[in-house]
């Protein structure tokens, strides 16, 4: 059967007509014909390579017998939970679904609007053949297109895939946690993530981050199974790893660092345990499948992908978004906003994380590497490439962070519970973790509402200003001019702004993402912050730094 699959994939690669397929894609794509033809050739080669890999992996896989594991320890002693534990975890996932469906139709933010305009309402042909912006999370764009096509162009339809992927990541965390800790700790970690305002927010964001989180957890679970195994199990685990890892990469390209981290850990384990030679091949085939599936998924858009991602974000512009210190501050501020007690609670959480890291390090250093190394590689490479370093790039590690936090609570209770309290340590740890979950749930109201309130800003200006007196800048252009269809003027440079001002008694300027505007249009930013302009109204949403600012200039007679 495996050979038949391999031959079928190779046959598809051989018969696919390059020129005709490229022309068909070009009829709807944002890319030029030459780029698409190159992509079709890559797709043919990737398909042939994938088919050959299927055949080779089946031919050279271990056929039987037992061998040493690359990593000792296996599953947690409590890895086979009772039906009650599974039922409780399922109930938590249902609660998580309800929390993520509430207020799902609230206002979109810029990246979501960009996804809706470019991919949500476009043809599927355009979606699978275009990669003209770094904002394209390819797998999510496809899911969003299917959802919007079936349910209509609404905010909730655009976000529905993120909700589903977010809820699936809760169940995935539960199953992963059973491999490394007790059912009680696994359940509490799942509950904490279910009521986390950050996880709810990402699950209501039409981007690929919850899909990447799901893939990260599933791929890590399969990786553990691979390095733990002591007997041949066929291609089930290698193919499962390849599918999970490539799905994450298809969601967001930075997931490649997850695979790179696993590969580095595998090399280290092979070096430490030379006696486990029999367990090297299955893990090798897992990485081969991850590479082949990822290349196959990106093949058609790969020429565009390389061109789009090879350059730095906002080239030639100085911005705090590339500063690691800014990223640390922003991450801290975002986490503090989602915790009762703010920064004090965050500092206390840091102590618990340190204890949790120590505990997992004592349990297995390889586990610690699985938890931490992907995030370290992501930060290192993104900074080296000159790209903006967003805290959301590390959301794929949220499940691991929660596990570390819950372990830290157990260790902290163990350190503090002395004397007559020793016998109550487990109950006290449960109580402390439950209180943490309740406290986290108390911050959920801050999560709901428009991520950016473009609708309110548009209505405000419609009531107070004539259309010919209103102009937009940079990241305000798409939401107002394209998505809302406002008949306002687009300003591209300082000269355009000054010409727009000329002859008008009153000028209204609407902008968003002030940090971005200050970086890409410093001259305009300087003029808008001069004494000639004042802030008329600021519209805040739940997205940090995404405020919409309406500025007004009243002519003093100098322009007539």
PLM-predicted stretches and their roles:
Residues 2-67, 71, 77, 89-417, ...:
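Membrane-proximal helix-loop-helix interfaces that form the catalytic/acceptor-binding platform
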Residues 422:
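Catalytic-domain carbohydrate-binding cleft regions of carbohydrate-active enzymes
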Residues 86:
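Serine-esterase "nucleophile elbow" of acetyl-processing enzymes
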